Amino acid sequence: MSNILNSAEALIGEETGKWDCSEFVSHVYSLHGISVPQSSAQIWSNGKNGNGSAGDIVCWSGHVGICDGNGNVIHSYNDNKNIRKDSIANVSKWDKREVKGYRRF
């Protein structure tokens, strides 16, 4: 899973303008030959249980990102769809929603 994390971290700061959160996750996993749905609801429904390790997908209601294993998430967060790294706790606070859990594919 560290290869997935490395691929996600390499995209931090990119102003892609093309990926929402689930599309970003799907793209990163696809770089490693792993198919992931392009919908946060489908990621939650179809993934296996994870534990927040590096490369796991952290899921909120309507949002997903890739865990770094240290309490942070790499994700596409805002209207500009920039790739950024934030603490999972801050994302939960900003969005006023709790983490549903973690998924692996």
Mark where each language-model region is.
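Active-site nucleophilic cysteine motif
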Residues: T16-H32
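...with weaker cross-activation on analogous glycine-rich loops/strands in unrelated enzymes
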Residues: S2, I34-K100
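Extracytoplasmic/secreted envelope proteins and their assembly/folding machinery
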Residues: L5, E9, S22-S26, G52
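Generic intrinsically disordered, low-complexity segments enriched for polar/acidic and small residues
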Residues: C21, S26, I74, V99-Y102
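Intrinsically disordered, low-complexity
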Residues: M1-E15, S92-F105
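Sec-exported extracytoplasmic/periplasmic mature domains
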Residues: E9-G13, Y29-I34, H63
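Short N-terminal micro-motifs specific to bacterial/archaeal maturation
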Residues: E15-T16, N46
